[in-house]
C-alpha cells in the first residue's frame, strides 16, 4: 500500500474508487495499491 498525495492508475487493471471519503486505487497487482493521504 502506497500512501500518496496524488493517486493515479498505473496499469489498465487499476481502478480508482472512493471509500469513506478516501480515494483509493485497487488492482490485481498488489504493488499498485494506493491510498490518498
Curated annotation (Swiss-Prot):
GO terms of molecular function: structural constituent of ribosome
Entry GO terms, CC: cytoplasm; ribonucleoprotein complex; ribosome
Keyword entries, A-Z: Ribonucleoprotein, Ribosomal protein
Pfam families: Ribosomal_L36
GO annotation (BP), single: translation
UniProt superkingdom: Bacteria
Signal peptide range in chain numbering: none
Family, per entry: Belongs to the bacterial ribosomal protein bL36 family.
PANTHER family recorded: 50S RIBOSOMAL PROTEIN L36, CHLOROPLASTIC (PTHR42888), LARGE RIBOSOMAL SUBUNIT PROTEIN BL36C (PTHR42888:SF1)
UniProt-recorded name of the protein: Large ribosomal subunit protein bL36
Lineage summary: Bacteria, Pseudomonadati, Pseudomonadota, Gammaproteobacteria, Alteromonadales
